[in-house]
Structure formats: structure tokens, C-alpha cells
Regions:
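Hydrophobic h-region of N-terminal signal peptides that target proteins for export
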Residues: 7-16
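Beta-solenoid repeat scaffold
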Residues: 32-75, 82-93, 115-120
């Protein structure tokens, strides 16, 4: 028995073959013919107007790797696009820059409608547009996630100016979700001036009742100022954890769907105009241990906002807020700390119901209330909350302690180069 265990422990690790290619057709064939554990190297240089389709099947223990010869030096330009299909592929070190000429996504986790990517990973890559770059398309998206159990991590994504969400998770019968987006740097995106400019959207109205079970964690969103919804949740059972939002003129919005968790996120407005926090719509959400500081937004961009619902709402309307747990959050020096029962839609007449506020701390600005109410909430539970100011529009709550000397430790802005691809730091 000991001899058998020793043999297993010291068994040699078998490495796959490595093949270097310099054009899209050679890359396509190399990935198609690759065996689990093989590595395909894409030569450094300008891969202009390249439609690169990478379709292959590795295994969990031996994925097929497609990487840049030198991280960041294999650059796709012009009318290029990248598509992945199959399973257990890892793509790393590529730079998609100033792409134009195609209305299709820059990067898709599918070859076509019949061949999706599952259990694939794009890591240490960049998708960027220079400040002076003018795309020819009026509308497009940059990244589309399809299939299931894919990863997008340690990437830099910035500079989109045209209409269209930057990153979309698509859901459906063949696209159940369960994706993991982490350690990405979502850089500046200028104001669009209309809807359709989200940085990240998971689902849409039609798929909003699906359990997507996506995990979005430890990403940086910096100056993503495209529209009110920086992150737009439109599905159920997603988790947004430990992300950092710096000077974002928008919010993490639970727009459609139920049972999502928003926890341990950091929102730093740095007194930039219209910077926002968390907007809640729907049922059974949990807003836990978030820190929101120096935000200048109001209305939908309030630090934490609970929205009024529309009776018998359609899927793309406003469902009533029900049974939300708001616990352990800190709000420091925000223009508006918490807003209950708000909506700018006249037919939204259903107030939040069944909400539990527990162990939250609020330090409001001088002369500002801790909590503002537009439409009185129903059946709220208040436990061990503390604020330096009184609320407005609410009766006295034994579970909301007034402490004019309450202090909350402020957070400093983290280093921006701690996120994204290693070769861009």
C-alpha cells in the first residue's frame, strides 16, 4: 500500500505539446486539433482585421491554453473579433484595441448559436479604446458570455464610448449562467446620455426570473459614468461581493430578479457629482456589510435606495421591494444616505414591504437626515441601527438610535494598479 501511494505521489506530470502560430487559420486548426494539456502560442505583433475562432475541448485537469507569445504584445486591431467554443479553454495575454468595423461583440463565449463555450476562461487580457478613438458602429457590445461556468478575470476593460453594454451575461435554455467575473479593472467610460450604456449586465427582462447564479467579486469599477446603472442585475440568485466602485456616476442596480446578495463592496464617490451606491428592486435581496462614502448622488443615485413598485408590473417594469435584509452597512458623509419608497414613475405606488434593517450605521452630513422617506414603508423591522441624525417621514423607531457623536472610519482610495492584467500594472 505504501509503495502504491509513493508511486502515485511521485508520478511525473505529463505536459502537452506547445505550438506557435502566426495567423488566424493556423490558430484555428491548432486549437481544433489540440489535445488536452496542449498550449497554442500566438506570435507577437498586430493581428489586424482578424476573425479568430478558437474551438476545442480540453478537460478540467488538462485545459487547452491559448496565450500570447509575450503578454500584451499580441494585439488585435481593425475589424477583429474573438470567439470561443467548446470546453476547458484558457485564453491569456491578448490585447484587443481600437476595434471597429463589425457590429458584433469583440469577444464572445460562443462560436455561433449552436456552439457555446463552457468551463472556459479569459484571463490577463485587455479590451481597450483610446480616448481619441472613434468607432464606426453606433451600437455594439464588447463581451458576451454564453454557455455555463465561464470565467472572465484579471482583465482591463475601458474606453467604450458607443451605445451598448460593455459586458453582457446572456441567459436562456442553453445559457444557464453560473459564470465567475473577478479581479477585473473596468476603467473609465464616458457619459452616454441615454439608456444602454451599462458596464455589466447579467440577464435581461425576458430572462429576469432565471437563477443565473453568477459571482461578481473583487473587481474595480473606476469612473464608469455611462448611465445610471453601472451594474444592472436582471436575473436571480447572483452575488456581488467585495467589488470597489470609485467615482462612478451610477449605481449597482438590482433592476430585475430576486434573491441576490450585495455584500462587502466599497463605494467611494470622492465628492464627484452624481456618484451613486445601491438601488434595490424585487424580492428577498440581501444588502450586507457594504461601505458607502462621499457619494454625491440623489434620487436613484442615493447611497442605498429602495424603489416603489408598480401594481401588476410587467417584466420590464418595477416589481415591489419585498423582504430585503439590509445589515451591517456603513454610510459616511453621503449627500443622501438612504432613501425609502422612491420612484420617478407616477404609477409606482407600492412601497417597500417586509424590509429588515439591522446594525447599520449612518453618519449624515450636517443638516441632512439619516434616512429619507418618500412613500412610507410597510412592516419594516429595525434592530440596532445607529445614526448621527434623525430620519424624516418615519415614526420614532426604537431600533434606530440617535448618536450625534457617532464616528465611522473613512476608507482611502485603493491603488488602481492592483486590478486587471499583470502586464498593464
Amino acid at each position: 500500500m505504501k509503495a502504491t501511494l509513493a508511486a502515485l505521489f511521485f508520478a511525473p506530470i505529463l505536459h502537452g505539446a506547445t505550438l506557435t502560430v502566426s495567423d488566424p487559420e493556423a490558430a484555428r486548426k491548432a486549437v481544433r486539433d489540440a489535445k488536452p494539456g496542449d498550449t497554442i502560442v500566438l506570435t507577437a505583433g498586430d493581428w489586424k482585421d482578424t476573425d479568430l475562432r478558437l474551438d476545442g475541448d480540453g478537460t478540467e485537469s488538462a485545459p487547452i491554453t491559448i496565450r500570447a507569445e509575450v503578454p500584451g504584445k499580441t494585439v488585435f486591431t481593425g475589424a477583429s473579433r474573438l470567439r470561443l467554443g467548446g470546453s476547458h479553454l484558457i485564453v491569456s495575454g491578448l490585447h484587443l484595441h481600437n476595434l471597429s468595423g463589425s457590429k458584433a461583440d469583440w469577444l464572445e463565449f460562443r462560436i455561433d448559436s449552436k456552439r457555446r463555450a463552457n468551463h472556459c476562461r479569459v484571463t490577463d487580457c485587455a479590451l481597450t479604446a483610446a480616448p481619441d478613438f472613434k468607432a464606426t458602429e453606433k451600437e455594439n457590445r464588447w463581451i458576451g458570455l454564453y454557455g455555463t461556468s465561464n470565467q472572465l478575470d484579471h482583465c482591463r476593460i475601458e474606453g467604450k464610448k458607443t451605445k451598448g453594454t460593455t459586458v453582457v451575461v446572456w441567459l436562456g435554455e442553453d445559457d444557464p449562467g453560473n459564470h465567475h467575473l473577478h479581479h477585473n479593472h473596468f476603467g473609465p467610460r464616458p457619459e452616454l446620455g441615454k439608456n444602454g450604456g451599462e458596464t455589466l449586465r447579467i440577464g435581461d427582462s425576458n430572462s429576469s426570473m432565471m437563477d443565473a447564479r453568477c459571482l461578481v467579486e473583487e473587481n474595480l469599477f473606476h469612473a464608469c459614468n455611462c448611465e445610471t446603472e453601472c451594474v444592472s442585475n436582471k436575473s436571480c440568485s447572483n452575488t456581488y461581493r467585495a467589488n470597489t466602485f470609485i467615482e462612478v456616476e451610477g449605481t449597482l442596480t438590482l433592476r430585475h430578479g430576486n434573491r441576490c446578495i450585495v455584500e462587502k463592496n466599497l463605494f467611494l464617490g470622492n465628492h464627484k457629482t452624481r456618484t451613486g451606491g445601491i438601488r434595490v428592486i424585487g424580492e428577498d435581496h440581501q444588502i450586507l456589510d457594504n461601505h458607502l462614502q462621499d457619494l454625491e448622488g440623489d434620487g436613484f443615485r442615493t447611497a442605498i435606495t429602495l424603489i416603489n413598485g408598480i401594481p401588476d408590473s410587467v417584466l420590464n417594469g418595477y416589481f415591489q421591494v419585498k423582504n430585503t435584509l439590509i445589515r451591517g452597512n456603513t454610510m459616511l458623509n453621503c449627500k443622501h444616505s438612504m432613501l425609502l419608497g422612491y420612484n420617478d414613475v407616477k404609477k409606482a405606488t407600492l412601497p417597500p414591504i417586509g424590509t429588515r434593517l439591522e446594525r447599520n450605521r449612518i453618519v449624515a452630513r450636517p443638516g441632512q437626515p439619516a434616512i429619507e422617506t418618500k412613500l412610507a414603508p410597510e412592516t419594516f423591522t429595525w434592530i440596532d441601527n445607529e445614526a448621527n441624525a434623525e430620519p424624516t417621514g418615519l415614526p420614532t423607531q426604537s431600533g434606530l438610535k440617535h448618536n450625534s457623536d457617532l464616528a465611522i472610519k473613512s476608507h482611502s482610495t485603493p491603488a488602481l494598479d492592483a486590478f486587471g492584467p499583470s502586464w498593464m500594472r
